Curated annotation (Swiss-Prot):
Its main location: cytoplasm. The gene is proQ. It is found in: Cytoplasm. It comes from Shigella dysenteriae serotype 1 (strain Sd197). The lineage of its organism: Bacteria, Pseudomonadati, Pseudomonadota, Gammaproteobacteria, Enterobacterales. GO terms for molecular function: RNA strand annealing activity; RNA strand-exchange activity. The keyword Plastid does not apply. InterPro entries: ProQ, ProQ/FinO, ProQ/FinO_sf, ProQ_C. This is RNA chaperone ProQ.
Length: 232
């Protein structure tokens, strides 16, 4: 008994219990709910083995029953087992609800710890970015152009073609017209022009009336035009 190795951590104790009582404890996967009062059964069964103390057994049991995989196993309809895997009664609703709350709290703590770690990493990265500026690249010296030897013939520089300014198109000369001052001087068949805005259309006198002069345009259309719209 003196040469038995000593278990130093709660995880090592749990591994020992899973090997010693495989129908009760498990080292991985979903765990089965334990019998109420199983601590005393452990003390009676493993007293002196592996130099285990009551304190070690109690700490290992606390770690085992607070693990997520054990809390997942505490659910409605599950049955408690003793050290040999024998059923020891079904879980009551109070214990199931307590395990559910413990699991939710454990998950919340883990999420809070992860969020805090991420925040610290971001702060550290931001602080490092402010303190350390990116090193500037050194400018490479410009290559020196070799000097022209004395007496060497200088190459003529290529002359750039001179671009000629585009000629501005001359505005067409406006045709000068003489306004008709007296329509009584006009004769039938006389050629003249009818002003329409800035343009003047060719026309022929058909008739002289009291309202104006009836003319015929080159298009064949005839109309009466007043004197101020007629020019030669």
């Amino acid at each position: 008994m003196e040469n038995q190795p000593k278990l130093n951590s709660s995880k090592e104790v749990i591994a020992f219990l899973a090997e010693r009582f495989p129908h009760c404890f498990s080292a991985e996967g979903e765990a089965r709910p334990l019998k109420i009062g199983i601590f005393q059964d452990l003390v009676d069964r493993v007293a002196g083995e592996m130099n285990l103390s009551k304190t070690q057994l109690r700490s290992a049991l606390r770690l085992y029953t607070s693990s997520w995989r054990y809390l997942y196993g505490v659910k409605p309809g599950a049955t408690r087992v003793d050290l040999d895997g024998n059923p020891c009664g079904e879980l009551d609703e109070q214990h199931v609800e307590h395990a559910r709350k413990q699991l939710e709290e454990a998950k919340a703590r883990v999420q809070a710890q992860r969020a805090e770690q991420q925040a610290k990493k971001r702060e550290a990265a931001a602080a490092a970015g402010e303190k350390e500026d990116a090193p500037r690249r050194e400018r490479k010296p410009r290559p020196t152009t070799p000097r022209r030897k004395e007496g060497a013939e200088r190459k003529p520089r290529a002359q750039k073609p001179v671009e000629k300014a585009p000629k501005t198109a001359k505005a067409p000369r406006e045709e000068q017209h003489t306004p008709v001052s007296d329509i009584s001087a006009l004769t039938v068949g006389q050629a003249l022009k009818v002003k329409a805005g800035q343009n003047a259309m060719d026309a022929t006198v058909l008739e002289i009336t009291k309202d104006g002069v009836r003319v015929q345009l080159n298009s064949g259309m005839s109309l009466i035009v007043r004197a101020e719209h007629l020019v030669f």
